């Protein structure tokens, strides 16, 4: 858990560093400060979220395959599906925590560098909820991949290849942007426009 929180703080540090370097350019732009900050930083933040989720999924299943833990658990009166759902719930909660940290930092940046910014909780909750929802299929697919591979490095390699392959897909094409490893790069403001 501390590694995931550290990853969330690392992703949240991007808008702060970016605004420290490019504050004049960014504050000169017209529009909603949260949308301005998201469009400038979300691609990198989303990639870090995905990579952290990939590592988490791989580690969850690696601990089960190590020392034949999967075989030992198969004799327990627990269905495999409920164990998968439990892992998905843990991964979703960790992802939600990371996104909440990142959104809090974005709000802090907006309040600090954009004096005219008015805090709107519903907008922040909608944006955070959207980012969590579009990332959950990626987390689910990565858990499926990790459960199918006994070797953690194989599932990690597959996940990283999928991240970098699908991140180059054009985001303006609605069909291509719905693929699980491409969807986390979507932003609510862009989705509303399309």
Predicted regions span which residues?
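Terminal transmembrane helical anchor/hairpin motif
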Residues: 18-37, 156-194
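Secretory targeting signals
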Residues: 4, 8-55, 85-150, 190, ...
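C-terminal halves and exits of single transmembrane alpha-helices
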Residues: 79-98, 171-179
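Helix-loop-helix units of permease transmembrane domains in multi-pass membrane transporters
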Residues: 60-92
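Pore- or pathway-lining transmembrane helices of multi-pass membrane proteins that form conduits
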Residues: 4-10, 150-167
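Hydrophobic alpha-helical segments typical of transmembrane helices
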Residues: 57, 68-69, 141, 180-183
């Amino acid at each position: 858990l501390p590694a995931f929180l550290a990853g969330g703080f690392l992703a949240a540090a991007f808008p702060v560093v970016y605004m420290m370097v490019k504050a004049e350019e960014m504050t000169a732009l017209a529009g909603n400060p949260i949308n301005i900050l998201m469009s400038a930083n979300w691609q990198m933040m989303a990639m870090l979220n995905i990579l952290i989720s990939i590592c988490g999924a791989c580690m969850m299943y690696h601990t089960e395959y190590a020392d034949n833990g999967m075989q030992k658990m198969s004799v327990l009166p627990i269905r495999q599906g409920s164990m998968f759902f439990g892992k998905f719930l843990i991964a979703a909660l960790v992802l939600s925590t990371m996104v909440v940290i990142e959104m809090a930092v974005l709000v802090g940046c907006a309040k600090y560098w954009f004096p005219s910014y008015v805090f709107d909780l519903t907008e922040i909750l909608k944006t955070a909820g959207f980012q969590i929802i579009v990332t959950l299929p990626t987390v689910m697919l990565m858990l499926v991949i990790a459960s199918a591979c006994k070797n953690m490095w194989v599932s990690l390699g597959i996940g990283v290849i999928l991240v970098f392959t699908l991140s180059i897909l054009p985001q303006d094409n609605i069909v291509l942007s719905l693929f699980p490893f491409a969807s986390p790069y979507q932003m609510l403001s862009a989705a509303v426009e399309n």
